[in-house]
């Protein structure tokens, strides 16, 4: 997700 910065695909 955006917050995790790892996947960046969840947008969470």
Curated annotation (Swiss-Prot):
What are the boundaries of the signal sequence?
none
Alphabetically ordered keywords of this record: Amidation, Amphibian defense peptide, Secreted
Main location (coarse class): secreted
What post-translational modification does the entry describe? Isomerization alpha-beta of the Asp-4 residue in caeridin 1.2; a cyclic succinimide may be formed between Asp-4 and Gly-5 residues in caeridin 1.3.
Location in the cell reads:
Secreted
| Source taxon at top rank | Eukaryota
Q: Name one GO biological process term.
A: defense response
Q: Which residues cross the membrane?
A: none
Tissue-level expression: Expressed by the skin dorsal glands.
Which residues are recorded as modified (Leucine amide)? 12
Name the GO cellular-component terms. Answer: extracellular region
Function summary: Caeridins show neither neuropeptide activity nor antibiotic activity.
Name it. Caeridin-1.1/1.2/1.3
The species this protein belongs to is: Ranoidea xanthomera
């Amino acid at each position: 997700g955006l917050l995790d910065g790892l996947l960046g695909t969840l947008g969470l």
